[in-house]
Amino acid sequence: MALGPGRFSVEPTRERPDSPPRSYGVPRRGGTFIEWAHVIERLTTSEGYWIGTVTPGGRPHVVPIWGCFVGDDLYLETGAPDTIKNRNLARNPNVWIHLDDVNDAVMVRGRGVELRSLDRELGEALASAMSGKYKGYDPTPDSWDNGGMWRIEPETVLAWKAMPTSTRWRFDKPG
């Protein structure tokens, strides 16, 4: 898989979420939106990510993990193939990703695509990004040849700083 324009490279359709009650004061049209560039900056600079997966019994499993942005795509490192999160993703690739800050919230709903035997260019880019972001961590380009690295294909992104800035972006289905 070579580097190229990723799923996050083009701003998806922006709209208001359906869920806030009218009493929250979120306008149905117009008003203040979060800018897509802000979402990309938050996803790129975040120290860590929380990933929510689904167990075989349908229960949520949420854990913090490391990740990075490379070539307009979000990549998340999930550790050894036998971890709960990896087993969950292998069975059901649906995920929710969110960042720590409740006052500057960014959440991504999508699907994980496991990467194995990465081409040299992507392996080098991921190893460089991860070692640059996480001090003391020094992966090699082939560190994920047996699994443990997932590219996130976003379907919906939600973000808000405060009411009434709730913003939702919807991506076109790939293919």
Question: Model-found features: residue ranges?
Answer:
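Charged, gly/pro-rich active-site loop segments
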Residues: 2-33, 103-175
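Short, basic/aromatic recognition patches
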Residues: 22-50
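A generic local structural motif
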Residues: 35-38, 62-63, 82, 137-138
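Tryptophan-centered motif/residue detector
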Residues: 36, 50, 66-69, 160, ...
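Amphipathic alpha-helical interface surfaces
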Residues: 39, 85, 122-126
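Short beta-strand segments
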Residues: 46-81, 87, 95-99, 107-111
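Generic structural signal for secondary-structure transition and capping sites
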Residues: 47-48, 94, 135, 157
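Phosphate-coordinating loops and pocket residues in cytosolic domains that bind phosphorylated ligands
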Residues: 91
